[in-house]
């Protein structure tokens, strides 16, 4: 693509926020392209069933929902380009990792958030070989086996309950002495006889050559260590916003989320005029598809207003 071709708006990210923004831009005749990113469709594509998105009384698979939205975007004539953004220059030149450069009048960042791993030696080698961040994707490989979930929030509790349906035993390894999850999710875990909770515990070592066979656990309250034999370890300790590529261009929180809202009339705009943001790369409290979609809509409408002025 010729680097001189200029877009009205480049949307970075293809989850609910990015694709919704694309729909609203297309309807307003704003020349738009979507850069899909390293997980086209976003995190929702690995969610087996979404039952809280309005309009689907019987629920809908996350992958199907995102493919339907993607097709809707394409039907409006918006190009969805496979690629990852390397950096954005101050004049809104968007450079992709393959060296291609796009020129735009405005940018909507909707890159979402990536899985937080334990950052232990050999972790990368063991991902897919006993280690996973997606219980719904990989859980069935551990039927009648012993697994553990690391974390204490809603996702960790949901994963543990899901895994208990077909595994032999589930450990929950949590570094605190109480969960951060909602009471509803906590009750499901606490009332499940197949789930054993290891409070005040942290994974300190991953053991196994070609695949994970056990982990070394430290009790951070009494200092005791023990080895836990496992067939699988599921990490559910949160997500990191995919914002490193911004490289100091826009203001970020300490957690990496993009700061917006300083302009009362353009609530989704960053501290850089013409760069807007929406979805999980902004919102650190509520990782919900419907919220991301709504923010994507607002970002598009506000980008349109800014472009007109």
Residue ranges and their predicted role:
Residues 80, 109, 133, 197-199, ...:
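A structural signal for the hydrophobic beta-strands that form the central parallel beta-sheet
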Residues 291-307:
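An active-site-proximal "capping" alpha-helix that borders the catalytic cofactor pocket
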Residues 15-17, 39, 113-115, 154-155, ...:
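Residue-level detector of alpha-helix initiation sites
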Residues 113-166:
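Glycine-rich dinucleotide-binding loop and its adjacent helix/turn
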Residues 119, 125-141, 237-291, 295:
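FAD-site-proximal beta/loop scaffold in flavoenzymes
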Residues 5, 73-95, 101-104, 165-262, ...:
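A Rossmann-like FAD-binding core segment of flavoenzymes
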Residues 7-76, 157-183, 253:
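Beta1-alpha1 glycine-rich phosphate/pyrophosphate-binding loop at the start
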């Amino acid at each position: 693509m010729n680097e001189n071709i200029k877009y009205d708006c480049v949307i970075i990210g293809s989850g609910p926020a990015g694709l919704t923004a694309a729909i609203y831009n297309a309807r307003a005749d704003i020349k738009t392209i979507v850069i899909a990113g390293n997980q086209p469709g976003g995190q929702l594509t690995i969610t087996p069933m979404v039952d809280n998105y309005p309009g689907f009384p019987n629920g809908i698979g996350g992958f199907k929902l995102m493919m339907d939205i993607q097709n809707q975007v394409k039907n409006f004539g918006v190009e969805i380009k496979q690629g990852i953004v390397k950096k954005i220059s101050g004049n809104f030149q968007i450079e992709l990792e393959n060296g291609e450069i796009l020129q735009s009048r405005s940018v909507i960042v909707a890159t979402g958030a990536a899985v937080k791993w334990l950052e232990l030696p050999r972790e990368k080698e063991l991902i897919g070989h006993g280690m996973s961040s997606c219980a719904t994707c990989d859980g069935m490989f551990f039927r009648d086996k012993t697994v553990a979930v690391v974390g204490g929030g809603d996702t960790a509790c949901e994963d543990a309950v899901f895994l208990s349906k077909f595994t032999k035993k589930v450990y929950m390894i949590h570094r605190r002495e109480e969960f951060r999850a909602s009471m509803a999710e906590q009750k499901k875990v606490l009332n499940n006889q197949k789930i054993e909770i290891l409070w005040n515990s942290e994974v300190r070592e991953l053991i196994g050559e070609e695949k994970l066979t056990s982990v070394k656990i430290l009790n951070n309250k009494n200092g005791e260590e023990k080895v836990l034999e496992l067939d699988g370890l599921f990490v559910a300790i949160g997500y990191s916003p995919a914002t490193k590529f911004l490289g100091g261009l826009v203001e970020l929180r300490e957690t990496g989320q993009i700061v917006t809202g300083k302009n009362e009339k353009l609530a989704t705009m960053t501290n850089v005029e013409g760069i807007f943001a929406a979805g999980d790369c902004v919102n650190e409290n509520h990782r919900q598809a419907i919220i991301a979609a709504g923010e994507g809509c607002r970002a598009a409408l506000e980008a349109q207003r800014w472009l007109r002025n």
